[in-house]
Amino acid sequence: MLTTGGAGFVGSNLTMAPARSHPDSNVIAFDNLHRKGSELNLDRLAEAGVEFVRGDVRSPADLAALTPPDVLIECSAEPSVMSGADGDSSYLYETNLTGAYNC
């Protein structure tokens, strides 16, 4: 199982439950750690038996480096309503649209 955005609030919680209930399965959290605080979930993920892979959904090469999963949970996103308020919304579009397409 692969969860993109796996170190974020939603992604980490959705990833830990199956990892705990199926300890023999290969569960991976994939995240670029762009959002402040995401790194605080890494210890909890490791304790639950989740493998962490740092990568970016905007990069097809990062995704191609992974073994194709049986299950994909796509939680990567730029959720901030202020994203792009500075006049540059490229990160928002590249993550939320292109990133989801790449998955």
What are these regions (language model features)?
Residues M1-C103:
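N-terminal Rossmann-like NAD(P)+-binding domain of SDR-like oxidoreductases, especially those catalyzing
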